[in-house]
Amino acid sequence: MKINRPLSPHLTIYKPQLTSTFSIFHRISGAFLATMVLFSILFFKIGDLSLTFYHFYQYFFFLTFYLNWFIISLVNFTLLALCYHMSNGVRHLLWDLGFFLELSKVYTSGIIMLFCAAFLALLNIIRQHWSNGQIPY
């Protein structure tokens, strides 16, 4: 007997849960941070590839002069991903120690983690503006 239905349910029929969403974004932020570390190492190695530093300075001048808004946005997004990944990592460490394992506490710790990540990212962005002198003391 042949039944016209899938063997296993597809992901689209499930309602997204807070815990699964946080898990997916934790993996995405980890992959993004690993990519940013790789590209930053490659960026700093560009100066070693040329015989003179003229091309490196020319490239760096292009980035800072023409793509300043892009670099600032990328740094802020990377800081947001780092704060989220770090806060969720602390949450996972607390789970490993046996804390917050009840379902209601899992959701509560997820919301607290999200607010901590947003607060840390906001503090980093404010500190970045202060160090550039855009906000007077």
From Swiss-Prot:
Membrane topology: Multi-pass membrane protein
GO cellular component: mitochondrial inner membrane
A Pfam family assignment: Sdh_cyt
Entry keyword Ribonucleoprotein: no
UniProt cofactor note: The heme is bound between the two transmembrane subunits.
Keywords, sorted A to Z: Electron transport, Heme, Iron, Membrane, Metal-binding, Mitochondrion, Mitochondrion inner membrane, Transmembrane, Transmembrane helix, Transport, Tricarboxylic acid cycle
Main location, first listed in the record: mitochondrion
CDD domains cross-referenced by the UniProt entry: SQR_TypeC_SdhC
UniProt xrefs under SUPFAM superfamilies: Fumarate reductase respiratory complex transmembrane subunits (SSF81343)
Pathway: Carbohydrate metabolism; tricarboxylic acid cycle
Transmembrane segments: 31-51, 60-80, 106-126
rRNA processing is among the record's keywords: no
Family: Belongs to the cytochrome b560 family.
Subunit relationships: Forms part of complex II containing four subunits: a 70 kDa flavoprotein (FP), a 27 kDa iron-sulfur protein (IP), a cytochrome B and a membrane-anchoring protein.
Role, per record: Membrane-anchoring subunit of succinate dehydrogenase (SDH) that is involved in complex II of the mitochondrial electron transport chain and is responsible for transferring electrons from succinate to ubiquinone (coenzyme Q).
Protein name per its UniProtKB record: Succinate dehydrogenase cytochrome b560 subunit
Organism: Marchantia polymorpha
